[in-house]
Structures are given as C-alpha cells and as structure tokens.
C-alpha cells in the first residue's frame, strides 16, 4: 500500500530545537540510527561531513541498523552465499561510515542480519535457528573485516523484540525459545569478540501494561539474554491506521519499568526516541512532543537517548540544526526566540511494504525508509 508524505526540509529541525532551552548542549540527543536507505548512495566525503556535524552536536553514537536485509540490501562486501542475490549491494556504506567515524570521533554500532519475513508470526524454532546461524556468519565476517577498528563500539541486533509475539501465540513461541535459539547465541558470540551488544525492543501500549512489560524483560534476562545496552523504542511516533502505539503522557511509566529491570541485571538503559509524527505525513514531530519525549526519557533513567532516524533529519535538517545551535551558543538567546521566516521546500516520498517493513521509493528508484515498524 502506497502512502505519501511531504517533509518541509528547511525548518524541519528548527521545530525540534525550538522546544529546547538555551542550554541545548546539556539536553541534546546522544546519537542517531542510520538505516542506510539514503546514506548508502552518498559519497565518502558527504558521510564524513555528516558525521562531523553529528559529533559537534553531541550525537556521537551512530547505529548502522543493518549489515544486510534479506533479499534487498547489503551494506558491506560479503562473500556469504545467502547474500549474493541481494537486490541492492551498496557494500561500501560500512567502510565509509567507519572512516567517517574515525575522522569525526564518533562511535559506531554495526547492525547484523535482518529477515522480517517470519518475525511477526513469530518464527518457529527451526526458523530462529536459521536466523541465529545467519547472524553468526555475518558477525564472523564483519569481525574479520573490521575487528581492529577502534571506532566500533559493538553490534546491533536489528530484529525488534516485542512481548506480544512471545506470549502464547503458539506453544513453542515462548521467551525461553526466543532467548535460547536466537538472542543468547548471537549476543554471546559478539561479546566473546570484545564487541558490545545492543537491542532496541518495541512495545505497544494498546496491547500491554507496564507490569506486563516488566515481567517480559525479567523473563528475558532471567533466561540468559544479557546484552550490554537495551535502547527501548519509545513508540511515540509509531501508529497503525492513526492509532498511536504510545502516548507521551504515560510513556514514562513503561520506560521506568524497563530501566528498573535493566538496572537489576547490570544492563545499560537507553531510549530510542522516535522523531516522526503519528499522522500520515510521518514528518518531524512538533517541538512540544519532542521535548516531552526527551525529558521523559532522561527522567526515566536513560543514560543515553538516540534518535530514529537519520532519514527523518536529512542533510537539510542538520543544516538547520547547525544554524540554530550556533546562534544559541554565541548569543545565549533561547532558540525559540531566534526563528526567522524561511522558505519551505517540500519533497514527496512514497512508501510501500517490503519484507515486513514499510519502505519508501526514492528518486534514485531504489528502496528507502525512514521509520521502524
């Protein structure tokens, strides 16, 4: 199904900044996800310039969401048989991003292998075993290529963990099954190489309470899944047919229970903050909502807040961010009072379904996306 949205590029990030005080450095975001849908087609110089901008804004944690998306995208030079028929082989993104991170002083998280075909069913035990085996092969290949790169902080498991897929939909669809047959072997293999592991679980307030979410994470960690970082998606931007997955008024209740369980198991708690609106535009949300999300995440105990995602920001958004941030630093005047009229240029982006994820069709006639499911 096709969905159309218009993004006002020139003022997109000014909306975000206008909700912050003049002490933007103390409350800024700590990083951003990059799914590669747009950066895969950019030059090394362009990516390096972007990383320098991110670093200057304090957004030093950059999560490359995928190494490979089954059948469609490949972002590093793989020799693995099951990745050779990938449609779009933009296999220099990881290399360009690593070099950019070293130049800028950022920290990279390398996404692993993603296959969304059976993930929401959820997968059977054999399917989980296959998913784990392929992730382990990708992990080994990434380590052989980039294991000595000091800019790499760790790896990111791109499969989204949601409680309601593992809550009795089938007899074998249990938390223990998910942990034993997929999460634990992948996590332990990465940690054995000296790389940290991050996951970004998703939840839906329409389907669960904070108590259910807390019990799910307690079961997951008790089963032996011990990542270094849980960056829970706040769900505020995501929606189905206009029905939001999470509400800014109550999202803190969910974040706090996850933070509590993470603390009990020695796992660092981050928040993956969704920047996009819940309406059909999927453009950057207004200043009040973004400020509320950021404040709530910090109050819940998040040691870092990283944004989803780079496609929502774009180069034009970073242009605006640099401009307003520089004014704030030099003149000590709240950013919201420094806005001046400027022209808006709208770019139309279309979306369709691809392999379990909503994806957009770009002017390059290649697939792109700017938000998670």
Residue ranges of each PLM-predicted region?
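Short, acidic/polar
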Residues: 40-55, 135-144, 209-221, 285-296
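Aromatic-lined substrate-binding rim segments of carbohydrate-active enzymes
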Residues: 47-117, 171-199, 246-253, 257
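Aromatic-lined carbohydrate-recognition surfaces of secreted/lumenal glycan-active proteins
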Residues: 109-121, 129, 153-160, 183-213, ...
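Active-site groove signature of glycoside hydrolases
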Residues: 113-117, 138-172, 229, 306
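Substrate-binding cleft of secreted/luminal carbohydrate-active enzymes
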Residues: 153, 227-244, 257, 264-330
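C-terminal outer-membrane/trafficking sorting elements
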Residues: 332-373
